């Protein structure tokens, strides 16, 4: 199973929290101390908590569960998309639209519209329109792709959320809580851990740290899915030749 060591975390800067004046007292159990007015996260807490979260993600993968990766700030955006694609999962990396989970019926209509426009752009429909109308539809399609492209093939609500920066993505976490969807989240010293089922206390700004969380999560999901495939193959009597 994919596990992350303290050495990996130190190298990525996972232990550097925010400035002490911005702290959230609810994060006190996960803070080791402060250095130069910056909180230091206790990695002796983070390592087992993160590895427990990864073990749970392996189980989600085994059940072919759908995981929605959420990270809309600049430091996380690209890495979130890459991790979701690498693990055949889904993502929101531009802006969280209120109601993305709690008002999924409306979101489904927008996804339907996006798919219609995608077909029109390739089947010659756009060519039959006036230049202005074609441009308007292209812009509409691009706008929808930007906000919904990562979930257009999700086909329903996710089984779990994996969030980078609990503070920044508090609306997504609240929606998941309302629907009983488990939340895995990186929670920095300035964030509120309430509503997070699997807390990963750590730096949520350093790109190397963000990539560490996401790569490990993607690997765990893929491992779980492959386990399931291997089990089915064994059951059916398919054994790969050496």
UniProtKB/Swiss-Prot annotation:
GO terms for molecular function: structural constituent of ribosome. The keyword Plastid does not apply. GO terms for cellular component: cytosolic small ribosomal subunit. The keyword NADP does not apply. Keywords: Ribonucleoprotein, Ribosomal protein. SUPFAM superfamilies: Ribosomal protein S2. One of its GO terms (biological process) is translation. It holds the Pfam family Ribosomal_S2. Gene3D superfamilies: Glucose-6-phosphate isomerase like protein, domain 1, Helix hairpin bin. NCBIfam families: rpsB_bact. Belongs to the universal ribosomal protein uS2 family. This is Small ribosomal subunit protein uS2. It comes from Vibrio vulnificus (strain YJ016). The gene is rpsB.
